[in-house]
Regions:
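Conserved N-terminal phosphate-binding loop of PLP-dependent enzymes in the Aspartate aminotransferase
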Residues: 2-442
Length: 442
């Protein structure tokens, strides 16, 4: 912030605002953008100059209905006028209705706990798995992100592990399959994910003390660079877990609620996890999360005294928002729209790949897509700096995108517009990306 070069004629250059920001805000991640966001609507956020910025990350990969959706605004106003927060042992109608609605959408996952954030829901899921199995060892992917709290942070390997002391005992990791950069290859050069998975679990078995509790996974690793688990992988992973008495936890923070073209990403594979967590997309940008599990697992947890009280567990306000999100998803056929709009966006990105050598790979599903930037398409040399320049040039032109930089990969853009995005907005975004690439390459 303090080193930002701002246009002195812009309302975004508010000296008092930036002085207070520099003085009082904790710097919790990368540098803040050099704009002041005053409002948001649909697929756009608007800065202090009134400039429309096309949001291709749905806020923090969450606003599946776009910003300030009128149905959500109406629900918040209505619920605030009745009851928003309760003692954690009290129930309200929105909580029970949302739990029933979610259970109907995910047969086999009949029990639901409503919380606030993805990290919190993963904490609850891991805690439940440890209690039910009697184990304490948790396995995750090397490119994972499950949150920044305790057990969730211990299962997060894509960033944020250095300098914080020991993680939870029994934290193990395996590589995620990467079709663009395979570690194990079939004779035709394609990714041999089964051999990779077998090898990984051989190492897990060697490390384990016999106390394996769960594997926690994202169906598409977002912060890991949009790495999609190939068809068949989840079934093989579930089998590995069953053979060892482990539970399979799926973290569908970003893939859940229609974004991939299924209501939940695991449904493409026909593999039901033992526990599923939802967050980001469930509240469409408001703080709502859920832990879903089978009646059998929940009964075992209950009998063993499962305890997970939090301040905002089962709050009626976010639950009412969740019900409205599901209503809008069904009414506006947004799961199907994720397929059709996703195809249009992916076709646009593939066209850019044909035009620009710096685009090494386009991947993902529905409206959760990735674009990997490289400096050499043949060697796949990472293009971190070029990717950062592209992101900057896109922002200047009115497109907000997010890029992740990980060891062994190029800079990967995570592209996830709202499910309500229009064809025209998709085309505009792709056009701005093309202009940004040209400008970044000089």
């Amino acid at each position: 912030m303090e080193n930002a070069a701002r246009n002195l004629t812009s309302r975004n250059d508010d000296p008092a605002f930036w002085a207070d920001a520099d003085k009082h805000l904790t710097r919790y991640g990368p540098a803040f953008e050099d704009v002041i966001i005053e409002r948001a609507e649909g697929s756009f956020v608007y800065d202090a100059d009134g400039r429309a910025i096309l949001d291709f990350t749905s806020g923090q990969m969450s606003a599946v209905l776009g910003h300030t959706h009128p149905d959500i605004v109406s629900t918040v106003n209505r619920q605030m006028a009745s009851v928003a927060h309760l003692f954690s042992g009290m129930l309200s109608r929105p909580v029970v209705e949302l739990a029933a609605r979610l259970a109907a959408l995910a047969p086999g996952l009949d029990r639901v706990q409503l919380l606030t954030t993805g990290a919190e829901s993963n904490e609850a899921a891991i805690r439940m798995a440890k209690l039910v199995t009697g184990g304490h060892e948790i396995v995750a992917f090397a490119q994972s992100w499950h949150g920044m709290t305790g057990a969730a942070a211990s299962a997060t390997y894509s960033a944020g592990r250095k300098g914080y002391g020991p993680v939870s005992a029994g934290s193990f990791v395996i590589p995620a399959p990467n079709a663009y950069r395979p570690r194990f290859r079939n004779p035709d050069g394609s990714n041999d994910w089964q051999a990779e998975l077998d090898d990984a679990f051989h190492l897990i078995d060697n490390q384990s003390t016999g106390n394996l509790a769960a594997f926690i996974a994202e169906p598409i690793l977002s912060s890991g660079g949009i790495l999609e688990l190939p068809l068949g992988y989840l079934a093989a992973l579930k089998k590995k877990c069953e053979e060892r008495g482990m539970l399979l936890i799926l973290d569908e923070a970003q893939t859940g609620v229609g974004r991939t073209g299924n209501m939940f990403a695991f449904q493409r594979d026909g593999v039901t996890p033992d526990i599923m967590t939802l967050s980001k997309t469930l509240g469409a940008g408001l703080p709502l999360a859920a832990v879903m599990t089978s009646a059998e697992v929940e009964q075992k947890a209950f009998e063993k005294g499962f305890l997970f009280y939090t301040t905002h567990v089962s709050d009626p306000l976010p639950a009412a928002v969740g019900v409205t999100v599901l209503d809008v998803m069904a009414r506006d056929n947004l799961v199907q729209q994720a397929i059709t709009r996703g195809k249009r966006l992916k076709d646009g990105l593939l066209a850019l790949q044909q035009r620009f050598e710096c685009i090494g790979d386009v991947r993902g599903r529905g409206l959760l897509l990735g674009l990997e930037v490289v400096t050499d398409r043949h060697t796949k040399a990472p293009g971190f700096e070029l990717g950062a320049k592209i992101m900057e040039e896109a922002m200047v032109r009115g497109l907000s995108m997010n890029i992740v930089k990980l060891p062994g990969m190029g800079g990967v853009f995570r592209i996830a517009p709202a499910l309500t995005v229009s064809d025209a907005e998709i085309d505009r975004g792709v056009e701005i990306m093309a202009d940004a690439i040209v400008a970044a390459q000089g």
